[in-house]
A protein has these predicted regions:
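Noncatalytic alpha-helical scaffold of FAD-dependent oxidoreductases
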Residues: 1-242
Length: 242
């Protein structure tokens, strides 16, 4: 909280804003990983809740209450998280030049499959809006990307042997063997998802950015209700729209 550069986020800030990355639909939100905290309330009193083990809650779970409170309840000084092992490796399947309907179908089909995916995002090239230039080619300069256009990205993580087989299964289940696809290996996959997580797709925009959480089945309908007047992309398989 008191060290590091001011333009970097903090763990307390992430908890206070209840912000989750692209893995959220698989591993849960940050609210699901906070076990306990210490902080100072508006009266200068030290507040402590929770503990250091998973089954520690007696009474009201204040750890969940502070998530998304934007610092209005307590200034956090110490947080205990439940953490998971980092994946050994990852690969990302990129399907090129898809419109919103087939992209939403591919993401939904992937999430509901048995291939245990951990990322599902659609980055469109439309609509073209004055003053809001989003250049996918400049944002995602990766050697393994074979061509330009919209990107439908699906990530698989785990052991190398498991990933290779699950990737083959996914490609066969989506029936995209003959379509324009790219596969990002571990290093480029990490770069790609860091850019997605950090909203670099909007880095050249001076406009306000809205965050909308919706049922995945409603994402296509929402885009058409907005009459393609706004630049967007959706994450979490369509459950999160920016």
């Amino acid at each position: 909280m008191f060290s590091g550069k001011s333009d970097y986020g903090t763990a307390a800030g992430q908890v206070a804003c209840n912000i989750s990355g692209p893995r959220r639909f698989k591993v849960g939100s940050i609210r699901d990983h906070v076990l306990g905290f210490r902080g100072v309330n508006g009266r200068g009193e030290i507040i402590k809740s929770g503990g250091v083990v998973v089954k520690n809650v007696t009474g009201y779970d204040l750890s969940k209450l502070i998530c998304g409170s934007y610092g209005t309840l307590v200034a956090l000084t110490e947080i205990t998280f439940k953490v998971l092992p980092a994946p050994e490796t990852s690969k990302t399947l990129i399907i090129h030049n898809q419109k919103i309907e087939p992209a939403a179908y591919f993401l939904d089909k992937s999430i509901s499959s048995s291939n245990d995916i951990s990322g599902a995002v659609f980055l469109p090239t439309e609509p073209k809006i004055a003053g809001c230039v989003m250049n996918i080619e400049n944002t995602f300069k990766l050697n393994d990307l074979k061509q330009d256009g919209s990107l439908t990205a699906i990530r698989i993580e785990g052991s190398k042997e498991s990933i290779d087989q699950r990737m083959k299964n996914l490609i066969n289940e989506l029936k995209i063997v003959n379509q324009n696809i790219s596969i990002l290996e571990t290093h480029q996959s990490e770069i790609f998802w860091n850019k997605v997580k950090n909203l670099e797709f909007f880095s050249s925009s001076k406009n306000s950015i809205l965050r909308i959480v919706i049922p995945p089945s409603e994402c296509v309908k929402l885009v058409y209700q907005l009459s393609h007047k706004y630049k967007y992309y959706f994450d979490w398989g369509g459950a999160l729209m920016w």
